Design a protein with these regions (language model features):
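Extended, well-ordered alpha-helical scaffold/bundle regions in very large, multi-domain proteins
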Residues: 193-216
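Active-site-proximal helix-loop-helix substrate-binding element of RNase H-like nuclease domains
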Residues: 37-40, 44-187, 197-199, 205
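Long, highly charged low-complexity segments
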Residues: 1-35, 58, 65-76
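Conserved acidic catalytic centers in enzymes
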Residues: 17, 107, 216
């Protein structure tokens, strides 16, 4: 758990990854449009900083919800790029908690599909392994989950934050590194215009998911 809240508002690129409690995601889809679930913690990575700020782990070690979310709002209010892997999920949850994001919202999952549309998997771990030679270390997380008798993928919120922090930070750091690779590939393949269109469409698609689409 970080001991301070750095001023990241002016960072040119900020990667963000949420840990959530989303109990019905497999049967009903993401819970954020109906607030079926919660943000458990926020991981942030910039050039020079990475931290995980836990707010709703069921077994303690949490930081003050309002202080963390006020800081998150300040962080995302700057003009820099905000980078997510599967942005509609994380941005949806941030929106559900009243967070308004300024600057470009970049989805590395979408960018990855543009760079290589023939992949079998667009998971962060798979992309990191194939393109960066890096994956998240999940050994300690799985050991802790085994001791607590929980599913490390679906029930992270049941673990104390100290077991989740490093894993969550790695998600944000890997997302930031992946974007550095994708930027050069988008330029090399000359698909900037397609990527820019996808990026501009994102807020529209998110609004449609949040409010629904009228069908006659």
């Amino acid at each position: 758990t970080p001991s301070h809240f750095p001023n990241l508002k002016d960072a040119k690129e900020i990667a963000i990854d949420l840990e959530t409690k989303d109990p019905n995601i497999k049967t009903k889809g993401p819970g954020w449009p109906t607030m079926d679930g919660n943000i458990v913690g926020v991981a942030v990575a910039t050039d020079g900083f990475a931290g995980y700020f836990p707010i709703a782990h069921e077994n303690g070690s949490n930081m003050d919800y309002k202080i963390v979310m006020d800081w998150v709002q300040e962080v995302v209010s700057g003009p820099g790029d905000k980078i997510f892997h599967n942005a509609s999920y994380d941005v949806g949850w941030l929106r559900a908690h009243g967070i308004k994001i300024s600057g470009r919202i970049i989805d590395t999952m979408v960018a990855s599909a543009l760079v290589d549309e023939n992949r079998f998997s667009y998971s962060l771990n798979s992309l990191g392994y194939d393109w960066l030679g890096e994956t998240k270390s999940e050994v300690e997380l799985k050991e802790a989950a085994s001791e607590w008798g929980i599913d490390p993928k679906q029930e992270l919120y049941k673990l104390p934050a100290k077991f989740v922090g490093f894993y969550a930070e790695q998600d944000a750091v890997l997302t930031l590194k992946l974007w550095q690779y994708l930027k050069t590939e988008i330029f090399r393949q000359e698909i900037q215009s397609v990527f820019n269109l996808e990026t501009e469409l994102f807020p529209v698609l998110l609004n449609m998911r949040a409010t629904g689409v009228r069908v006659n």
